[in-house]
């Protein structure tokens, strides 16, 4: 890396790294460092009247107070933080005091990883700490951390800009309390979900991510190209059709937890790639699946929060069963006053106009109903509510309702105004399924880019016979948002998709050299803030001369300074 791209603090740290090596101390040792305790466990297990406990810990220096021959640091490990008391004569028992006077006091910085061996004690101020007897350098940090400081309960120098936090999640995890806890809870959610499904006897499977046909959901896919086969492939939008093939093949129940991809918008509830759990169980229907879902979510909530309740956006949400069950057309009537039962596509289109909705000719009956529900109903269901019995036009993979003509045995679980789960009594009639796919094809021809393709191989599988089956998909990201009280999906994804980072435009060196500027001075001029040749047009040559000569001196570049007359000549040529 060019030294001009470094900050003053980064240069100092690199010099410290080199000085450590000159002393014979490797700043990035290869050997294993053996630890026997974590910070939180040390504090939890400490007893004042017990024999001093000898521990070996490792972590990152997060703060320090140097006081001559004795100092305090705060060490952060994977579980928390603990204070360490370091004295010169304890870590340097012999004549050589360099480990304290030079290494600890001058060459170590905040963010560095060290190992500490010592014994646990309580300070006069009452804080459980480690009295260091040996210090080992484990990894040098050559980029300063944005250390958050607190005074009278107020945070200073906070690393709280959302874009920076999401782009540099590694820094966010280090310096911001609570961030890591959110992701540990996410891990608990997935672990508990797996436990429930495994205990029920269902088999976890893996199915392809690259699909020849995008199927299993109504969504716009990402398209890629396989060079060897010279064919387009699609990143999967759902695992549904492959999992159903496995039910055809004889599995009692199968589930998959994995990534799906949808080439759609990004907002606080949507990310182009997201994690979903899909489950399919033979000989079950959507009524059974509602009950199973209640038990699953209740257990997850208890595992994560210790109770069946969670709080988000200031609202307390209870996952204790049972949940309300409400047909979608009844929900629309309840929220808008319009009864859509038996209405034609044109009649529903007229309702949309009366509701002053933006619609277009590509929208079929199902899409129109979906738009009405999304705009006027969805956001009103805060407590868990099963919205059931969707029109067939909205549900091309769902079995027709056993007693309600024109409707299907489908439910979506709404929580905090958003869909959390989608489930069916699965359509297993191959003739009916083919007709539904053809209807989707007509929608595609009308311009609906979310309509499903016809999957001939899936139809072939159904023709061999699929038993009555119920299936469900649950969004892990949204579930984590609910269980951890996060309002933005980016807070529960380690590395959410981001728009391209803004980069300062710079002219190529050749453009500067056309003015007679030596190549070695181009980077210096750009460091001074003149990234484009045009930036120099109206500058005072004497100021430019002072700026670049100052940088040459500050960074010890040892370049031969140009004269003011040289600089005047550069500027005149612009």
Model-derived segments and spans:
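Compact, charge-rich alpha-helical regulatory domains located at protein termini
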Residues: 501-574
């Amino acid at each position: 890396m060019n030294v001009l791209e470094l900050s003053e603090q980064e240069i100092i740290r690199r010099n410290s790294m080199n000085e450590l090596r000159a002393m014979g101390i490797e700043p990035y040792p290869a050997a294993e460092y053996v630890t026997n305790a974590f910070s939180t466990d040390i504090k939890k297990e400490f007893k004042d009247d017990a024999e001093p406990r000898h521990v070996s810990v490792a972590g990152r220096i997060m703060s320090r107070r140097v006081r001559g021959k004795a100092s305090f640091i705060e060490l952060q490990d994977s579980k928390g933080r603990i204070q360490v008391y370091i004295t010169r004569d304890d870590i340097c028992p012999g004549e050589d005091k360099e480990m304290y006077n030079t290494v600890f006091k001058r060459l170590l910085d905040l963010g560095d990883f060290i190992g500490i061996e010592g014994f646990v004690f309580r300070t006069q101020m009452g804080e459980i700490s480690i009295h260091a007897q040996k210090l080992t350098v484990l990894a040098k940090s050559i980029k300063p951390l944005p250390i958050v400081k607190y005074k009278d309960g107020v945070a200073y120098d906070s690393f709280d800009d959302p874009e920076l936090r999401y782009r540099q999640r590694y820094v966010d995890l280090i310096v911001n309390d609570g961030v890591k806890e959110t992701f540990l809870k996410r891990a608990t959610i997935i672990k508990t979900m797996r436990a429930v499904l495994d205990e029920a006897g269902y088999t976890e499977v893996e199915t392809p991510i690259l699909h020849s046909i995008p199927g299993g959901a109504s969504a716009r896919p990402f398209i890629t190209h396989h060079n060897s086969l010279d064919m387009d492939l699609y990143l999967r939008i759902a695992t549904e059709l492959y999992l159903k093939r496995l039910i055809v093949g004889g599995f009692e129940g199968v589930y998959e937890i994995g990534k799906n991809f949808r080439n759609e918008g990004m907002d606080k509830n949507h990310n182009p790639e997201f994690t979903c759990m899909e489950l399919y169980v033979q000989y079950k229907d959507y009524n059974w699946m509602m009950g199973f879902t209640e038990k699953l979510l209740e257990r997850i909530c208890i595992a994560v929060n210790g109770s069946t309740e969670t709080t988000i956006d200031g609202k307390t949400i209870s996952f204790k069963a049972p949940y309300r069950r409400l047909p979608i057309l009844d929900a629309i009537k309840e929220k808008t006053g319009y009864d859509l039962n038996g209405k034609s596509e044109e009649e529903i289109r007229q309702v949309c106009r009366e509701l002053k909705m933006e619609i277009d000719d590509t929208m079929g009956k199902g899409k129109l109903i979906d738009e009405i529900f999304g705009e006027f109903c969805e956001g009103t269901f805060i407590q868990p509510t099963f919205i059931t019995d969707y029109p067939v036009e909205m549900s091309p993979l769902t079995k027709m309702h056993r007693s309600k003509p024109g409707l299907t045995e489908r439910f979506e679980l709404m929580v905090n105004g958003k869909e959390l789960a989608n489930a069916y009594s699965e359509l297993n009639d191959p003739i009916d399924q083919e007709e539904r796919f053809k209807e989707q094809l007509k929608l595609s021809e009308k311009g609906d880019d979310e309509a499903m393709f016809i999957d001939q191989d899936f139809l072939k599988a159904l023709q061999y016979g699929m038993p009555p089956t119920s299936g469900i998909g649950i969004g892990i990201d949204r579930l984590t948002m609910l269980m951890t009280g996060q309002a933005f999906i980016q807070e529960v994804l380690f590395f959410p998709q981001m728009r391209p980072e803004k980069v300062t435009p710079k002219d190529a060196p050749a453009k500067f050299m056309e003015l007679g500027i030596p190549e070695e001075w181009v980077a210096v001029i750009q460091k001074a803030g003149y990234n484009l040749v045009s930036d120099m047009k109206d500058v005072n040559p004497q100021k430019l001369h002072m700026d670049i000569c100052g940088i040459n001196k500050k960074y010890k570049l040892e370049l031969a300074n140009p004269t003011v007359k040289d600089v005047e000549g550069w500027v005149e040529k612009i």
